[in-house]
A protein has these predicted regions:
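All-beta strand scaffolds that present successive hydrophobic residues in beta-strands
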Residues: 85-90, 109-115, 146-150, 170-176, ...
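Extracellular beta-strand/beta-solenoid scaffold signature
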Residues: 67-77, 97-104, 125-140, 157-164, ...
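Gram-positive cell-envelope targeting signals
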Residues: 1-42, 50-51, 103, 163, ...
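Extracellular beta-solenoid/beta-roll
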Residues: 341, 366, 370, 374-479
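A detector of tandemly repeated sequence units and domain arrays
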Residues: 33, 37-38, 45-49, 53-58, ...
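N-terminal segments that cap or nucleate solenoid repeat domains
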Residues: 64-125, 471-483
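Disordered, low-complexity segments in secreted/periplasmic proteins that are enriched in proline
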Residues: 26-74, 299, 358-363
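Post-signal-peptide, soluble extracytosolic/periplasmic N-terminal scaffold domains
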Residues: 106-182, 189-200, 217
């Protein structure tokens, strides 16, 4: 019989290939993962930190981006790396390479006095690796402690932060001058859980995305006492908060951005500080603000309640409204703060959804849940809320609020079941300057117009609940007590 040798050879080759393949699988070749399990290895491992610019930090005021981006570096390049107890006095560390630290501390107790640290580079990367991990900072501590006193730190490089604390690193900086020039170059900076203490610093930043007091993904702790902190760039607030930050007796100035920006589950406390901002009117924003608490959805901060506390001192706004909260849960507490608003101030407080072009939540569903408490406070301007938000506004301890309360549904889509509750204690008053709308009014104090005339209160059907003499009317769903 005549054999078909081509067919026999093909069959033999197929059997061999099947045997080799089975052997490889038996040795542990992972192949494709089973359904419901992520692939392993470099190709399937997500970056440790997703991309996304910090709110209020990106150039031209771009507050927040999308996920994607860089992971933690395997190592850092530095002019001097220290990993044991060391004292450096009167030294000069000059870094000129791309993405290099002048001083890197990984362990030990390192003390730097009367020294100069500089970073000058035209080809540094900046961006996420600088913001999240301190790549290219003049001084970076990732472990141990770094103490800097009576020194000068100057950077002129993208990503050239002054002093950066990351991870378990702790930095203490006192009586020192920090001057940064290029973008993504905060003055003092924490991320990834770092800790930084600052006392009597003079800090100035000139680049975009370069808050004088800056934090980023992974947060941390900052305690600042005294000093002057000035940021000049666009998208560079004086203070950018994705950490827990406490500041006292400091001058905080932003000349080209909002004064302070807080995102997500973080907190800032200001005591006897002078805070000022001058944010530009930008087409990508649906309003302009001085202090913002929000959630950008960039992944830079854990979702949760942001807390802003300010006692004593002053707040100055050179453009736009004062306090804005959107797409988040937030809590504001003001006590005896001297507030100066711009001539074109749009509002004292805005608690609404947004139509921001960068996508802060889903339009029509991105309101805010806000508790705002004022004590011993003068408040002037409009309070704005919408039905996809919940605002609980309390006037306490002799607070005087002069303005209107308005329901603005322009960013509320199809609306919701939210509302505004206004509570006025027996020592406080509301001086009404226009027709107002409040969901629930609890008043043990005074409600009058600028001429001292009582204001009529009606329900949503127009029924008079409390007759007044003023031309203005307050519309409520619920009146818990009668205004005096």
């Amino acid at each position: 019989m005549k054999r078909n040798w081509k067919r026999i050879n093909a069959l033999f080759l197929a059997i061999c290939l099947l045997f080799v393949s089975s052997f490889a699988l038996a040795e542990g070749n992972p192949g494709n993962p089973p359904d419901g399990q992520p692939p392993q290895g470099q190709g399937g491992t997500p970056p440790e930190k997703p991309d996304g610019e910090a709110p209020g930090e990106p150039p031209a005021g771009d507050m927040g981006g999308g996920p994607g981006g860089s992971s933690q570096p395997d190592s850092y390049a530095a002019v001097q790396t220290v990993s044991e107890d060391t004292q450096l006095s009167g030294v000069t560390l000059d870094s000129v390479a791309a993405d290099e630290n002048a001083l890197l501390v990984t362990a030990g107790n390192v003390q730097v006095t009367d020294s100069t640290l500089t970073r000058n580079s035209t080809d540094s990367t900046g961006g996420d690796s600088a913001s999240f991990y301190g790549v290219g900072a003049a001084a970076l501590v990732t472990g141990g402690t770094l103490k800097i006193r009576n020194s000068t730190i100057t950077t002129d490089a993208n990503g050239g932060a002054g002093v950066f604390a990351y991870g378990s690193g702790v930095a203490t900086v006192a009586d020192t001058t920090i001057d940064t020039t290029q973008d993504t170059s905060g003055g003092i900076h924490v991320a990834g859980g770092g800790t930084l203490y600052a006392s009597n610093l003079t800090v100035i930043t000139r680049g975009n995305s370069s808050a004088a007091i800056r934090s980023d993904r992974g947060g941390g702790t900052m305690v600042v006492d005294g000093g002057s902190y000035t940021s000049e760039g666009s998208g560079s607030p004086a203070v950018y908060v994705t950490a827990d930050i406490t500041i006292s007796n400091a001058q905080l100035t932003a000349t080209g951005s909002e004064a302070l920006c807080l995102e997500g589950l973080n907190s800032v406390s200001l005591t006897d500080c002078q805070l000022s901002g001058n944010m530009a009117d930008l087409s990508q924003n649906d309003n302009t603000w001085t202090v913002i608490l929000y959630q950008s959805m960039s992944g830079d901060s854990e979702v949760g309640k942001g807390t802003f506390t300010m006692e004593g001192g002053s707040l100055t706004s050179l453009n736009g409204g004062l306090f804005y909260t959107t797409n988040t849960e937030s809590e504001f507490t003001l006590r005896n703060v001297q507030i100066t608003a711009s001539d074109d101030c749009e509002y004292f407080l805005r608690c609404t959804g947004n139509q921001n072009q960068r996508g802060w939540g889903q339009s029509g569903q991105n309101g805010a849940d806000c508790v705002f408490t004022a004590a011993q406070q003068e408040m002037n301007g409009n309070v704005i809320w919408d039905s996809i938000s919940n605002l609980d506004l309390s006037l306490t301890e002799g607070t005087v609020f002069t303005g209107t309360v308005l329901d603005d549904e322009s960013c509320a889509g199809n609306g919701g079941n939210g509302g505004c509750t206004l509570t006025i204690d027996e020592s406080s008053s509301w001086v009404v300057t226009g027709n107002s709308v409040v969901t629930t009014l609890n008043c043990s104090g005074s409600i009058v117009d600028a001429e001292g005339r009582t204001v009529t209160i009606v329900d949503s059907n127009g029924n008079v609940l409390s007759e007044g003499e003023s031309e203005y009317t307050i519309t409520v769903n619920t009146l818990q007590s009668t205004a005096a």
